[in-house]
């Protein structure tokens, strides 16, 4: 089962700069290798900024509607002013900020809402608060764009804002990437179908530390999930558990695992030896094994070796 799951996709080996290019290259390679077995995949990797433009278009009328009460007088203007004042107090009490700190975040929430994001200023507040709490690596000057991106992804993929920001925060913390890079990966991943079981953001938050520890990059993590998704895996947990189990088994180095590596190519055996000497990562071994399994003519043997090293 495991060999069948991965054999179409070969080794990981991503070297492109952006998430769009990475997943687009994989899409092209999969279409060519599958030789018509799959329908043409939807082009992945639309920048989050482009996705966000769609939401801003929807919000254009709201922006126009907001400008009048802000500039006008009477009850509507008083209501808006009161909402903004309440917004700042909510932010301050939720985050324990100084009055000045809450004022600065209140301005961000106000501008975000005026740009057409959220059904109310309260919704924007909660989104900004989650970005601030879960994405601690985001610089202050990027909080507005990060909030807009998080809200856009939440709406687009019908996901909770807390899960969106937790996932993005874990990508930033573990892989050292920017908020834009994290959101671009989610936009590309979502368009590749990674949220089919409605767990993409939560799974990334859970497994990002494991992938980092194993030596994978953020792009490689999403590529592995995309490969498994295209092959019809039940859910992302199944895919990520395979990677987790693989790491455990190669670290353990049981006789069954060692015997399996003895049946693989000299190149993969060398990678395995280097890993055991502390000169490589689980990711190096993972890539080498997938390369071997994909090239084997004897698919029964490939499946047996895959089960031996992956545990399934």
Q: Where are the regions a protein language model picked out?
A:
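Short, intrinsically disordered, charge-balanced linker/junction segments flanking boundaries
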Residues: 305-312
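A short, structural motif
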Residues: 2-3, 14, 21, 28, ...
